[in-house]
């Protein structure tokens, strides 16, 4: 399958080219030339299938023509070495827990898949030239990518993160690894980090000296595999007879997660409605209300992984719907959750239902409560990170202690190593060239 740019100014690329390049030469995001439709027999039969079987079927629809089935199966099985269970919170609302991977965040799925697919292409090329992965993080992406790519031959990873704007636990997950992982502590906000990464891809001098790619959700090998757990969630709900009229609430920052859900829906997954759950960075909610996309500087919130003022994947959503605002608003609504509402939601869900979300999951739950569920509807919110990653916020809001998983404790015992970085592209470019 070929992959075209959302800016439509360059020729379509092969899967390998799209994965290795990350961003198209015209600064657009790659999209599959066609979105395969999965037949109803598969959808109805998923409740009898394992997560691996479901994911392999979905992966084959996109990637099956570009790599041997045996290699794709290995990548899927290596990626999904953990489950993504659906857990009841109330009689009508369920949590899709995406934090059971190595770094306790949903991004483990996409990051591990991309690391293995990129490694496959590098090995197939027999390339002697090292591939440099650039990734901007507002929280969980950095840890998921760093751990997914750790010690993968032929790959170096540079994680750009905003100084003082990720939690201490998140920071230690990518600043303590060393080896082929370098953390760059940028004096700015996430949008500055993302702008540096995008600028690097279109800089002729850098690309002449370094093979660059991205592991943010702008990379097709990062965001497309996130469709796997939407199908798996539906299968789990179908097993208990609750799959009809699903309303799925997606905590949204850079919108890769929501885009993956929309791709799954276009492939035939019967979701009735999506909610884009925003924090105070609500440019998408503004777009839904006005039809105008007006990016603005991000503001810091308790749900820091969603602190994005110019989400990259908006381009993919717009492209997916052909720019049809009415079609977008028919399927997707939005919500806005303030820090005060995050704290109140955390306290209420723990006290009333005995379930502990993280601040991002709290936004997803709050969005469902804001919209309300009609008779016959069932709500599912994506619980994107383990609450222990936001210990101070969760414990202060709920008045209860959160147990820290052992694998998270191991990260916390490491020594921080990071490189201070100005937010200017000149400083970033000079640093990368010094590493060539």
Model regions: which residues?
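PLP-dependent amino-acid enzyme catalytic core
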Residues: 1-436
